[in-house]
């Protein structure tokens, strides 16, 4: 089966409009007069992104949050969404709609339209397009990192991983860890605050390591991540302990929806973020644990295939 990266490479051959940014970014950036319209689209598929017994309201929340996270990486103000919905069981559909109304209300985002289709199979697939207006020019991209920049990440990593494992094991009451997996928070305010001074920014839905490598590739430079600096929550440490292995897992699993960004050394960071590395000459991703080099793991993060 074609991998995600291989298929995107095929599309890249004819996605030549400047707004597409070479399909190397989180979203399209369309110049409209004096403004920039930010457009992104994400999909969720049953048994890939959510299980058949998942709460439909949680599915709706995550579908919206994952799209808004891409807008956050552009420092954008959301203005609305378009839903692509595969019809099925009536109770599930109604619960999804109620959850969608709730999450859109939480973020103050309008439902502008979309499309529905009947489901001839036994698995659902859902899509959402999110629209936003850039709050800063130039609009941040993955490709602007500069040698000497400090690499930061907002929030903490690994909670979604722990939440997924606990839910998968049948635990019903796992609190914040379950919420991190089922109902991630898009860092819209943080993205808007960071947009004026970052050199590069993206969200890390697929995992810190794989997305740091993507940023390095887009910027044609290298990024070194110090695993000793990976921010972990007390709940994650209580569940998995604080070790090199647990930090590696937190950095490579994904579903965190935090912001990864590069800023000049000495810049005053105006959001809750942790310095986790630096931009270096060369290319690709390298890892260390303090002063000790660390070999890259076989899998840096999540890729569809």
Predicted regions and their residues:
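Small-aliphatic-rich amphipathic alpha-helix that forms the alpha element of a beta-alpha
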Residues: 56-82, 95-106, 193, 207-215
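Active-site glycine-rich loop that binds ribose-phosphate moieties when present
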Residues: 129-140, 147, 174-193
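Extreme N-terminal cap/leader segments of soluble proteins
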Residues: 1-55, 74, 83, 103-104, ...
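Glycine-/charge-enriched secondary-structure boundary and capping motifs
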Residues: 1-5, 9-10, 88-112, 117-126, ...
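Short, compositionally biased
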Residues: 161-178
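Glycine-rich anion-binding loops of enzyme active sites
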Residues: 34, 44, 77-165
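Internal active-site segments that recognize and position negatively charged phosphoryl groups
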Residues: 146-155, 183-208
